[in-house]
A protein has these predicted regions:
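Conserved beta-strand positions in repeat-built beta-propeller and related beta-rich domains
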Residues: 73, 77-86, 124-130, 170-183, ...
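Asp-box/WD-like beta-propeller blade repeats and closely related beta-sheet repeat scaffolds
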Residues: 131-167, 172-179
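A short helix->beta-strand "capping" segment at the edge of beta-propeller domains
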Residues: 39-63, 246
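Beta-rich, blade/repeat-based domains predominating
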Residues: 60-76, 88-89, 107-125, 151-170, ...
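Short loop/turn segments that connect beta-strands within beta-propeller blades
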Residues: 94-99, 138-142, 192-197, 235-240, ...
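Secretory targeting and sorting signals
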Residues: 1-35
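A short loop-to-beta-strand structural motif that recurs across blades of beta-propeller domains
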Residues: 89-92, 133-135, 187-190, 230-232, ...
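Blade-level signature of beta-propeller repeat domains, shared across WD40, Kelch, NHL, RCC1
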Residues: 305-346
Length: 346
């Protein structure tokens, strides 16, 4: 996620996040099959179907931005609203069967940009982009605690997305520099130990990294560089404490739009979310463009971002968070392969 948009919307969202920071923050069915047709570049064009409207534009912040879709152990979908003001729901639950929406958690300070359940303690971890913290709550929104806060190697963080390894250690994209020119690269990828909360910088001087997800076999990371519209592959050492090799894996020709969060399915395919257009782009592990998933044409005018996607574990039921002037929505489609941990939050 990035809390701003291309053009005029970028300014509005940046102001909304600044306002949060100044106040202490910064009839149901499972996912239906999407319609599809061949695209010009060989990837299929798929149309997602509206599941439910989750939020409306907040008067105080001037926008709403849904992010961080993730399923809990009981199969319930949770999302975060990045720009929700103090006191309004910042974590919400969406019943994909009844399409009912209910509040889970709020506070007076956080601007939460992603969410994922830890395999270590089954708590929901939230990245507070404005506050530079990583908080956690129970699946019911209780016992709010701060897992990590403060500087890393002398510099504050803008924690954006997160991913857990199989042991529960956390890997975070630090989007420092997101609001500046790409050549002033200050972003990082940071590993945080599950037991000690000790932070280690794995990569630095990056152009505002955003999406982060493990490969299907947990041997490496996919990292989306928001400031470069590029996805990098990082091969990790055996215990995941160092990057052994890295390379640019694919480039996104997005024009004024930029890449956002990343999810990975059981076949290793990358679902690349986008800030600036309401579509998800799907690539093979070798960089082949397999599919583009968009909202219906009559809905696209009032929606400018599809910032994240989750696939229900063990199924191909996929749900993407879509936001814009019309509000915050969840759309559903059929994924190309089954969901795994790497496509469930972050």
């Amino acid at each position: 996620m990035e809390p701003h948009c291309p053009g005029p919307r970028r300014t509005v969202a940046a102001r909304a996040l600044a306002a949060l920071a100044l106040t202490g923050a910064a009839a149901g069915c499972a996912a239906p099959a999407a319609t599809s047709e061949d695209g010009e570049d060989g990837g299929t064009e798929r149309t997602a179907e509206l599941l439910v409207q989750v939020t409306s534009v907040h008067e105080e912040t001037g926008m709403t931005l849904l992010e961080g879709p993730t399923f809990d152990a009981d199969g319930r979908l949770l999302v975060v609203d990045v720009t929700a003001p103090a006191g309004e729901p910042k974590v919400l639950r969406v019943d994909t069967g009844s399409r009912e929406v209910s509040p889970v958690f709020t506070d007076g300070t956080g601007a939460y940009t992603s969410a994922q359940f830890s395999p270590h303690d089954d708590r929901l971890y939230l990245t507070d982009f404005a506050g530079g913290r990583i908080d956690s709550i129970t699946p019911e929104g209780e016992d709010h605690t701060t897992f990590f806060s403060g500087e890393v190697d002398g510099a504050p963080m803008n924690p954006d997305d997160l991913a857990f390894d199989e042991a529960g250690n956390m890997y975070v994209s630090d989007s420092a520099g997101f609001d500046g020119p790409a050549w002033e690269a200050r972003g990082r990828v940071v590993r945080i130990d599950r037991d000690t909360a000790e932070a280690t910088v794995l990569a630095e001087e990056l152009p505002a990294p955003n999406g982060i997800s493990f490969t299907a076999d947990f041997s490496g990371l996919w990292v989306g560089q928001y400031g470069a519209n590029r996805v990098d592959h990082y091969a990790l050492n055996e215990d995941g404490t160092e990057v052994e090799t890295s390379h640019a894996a694919l480039y996104f020709d997005g024009g004024t739009s930029r890449i956002d969060s990343i999810a990975v399915d059981a076949d290793g395919n990358l679902y690349q979310a986008v800030h600036g257009q309401p579509r998800i782009f799907v690539y093979s592990p070798l960089g082949e463009h397999l599919a583009t998933v968009g909202v219906p044409a009559d809905a696209a005018e009032g929606l400018y971002s599809a910032t994240n996607v989750a696939i229900a574990p063990g199924t191909t039921d996929a749900y993407m968070t879509v936001s814009g002037d019309d509000g915050g929505f969840v759309y559903s489609f059929d994924a190309l392969a089954e969901g795994i941990r790497q496509s469930n939050g972050g």
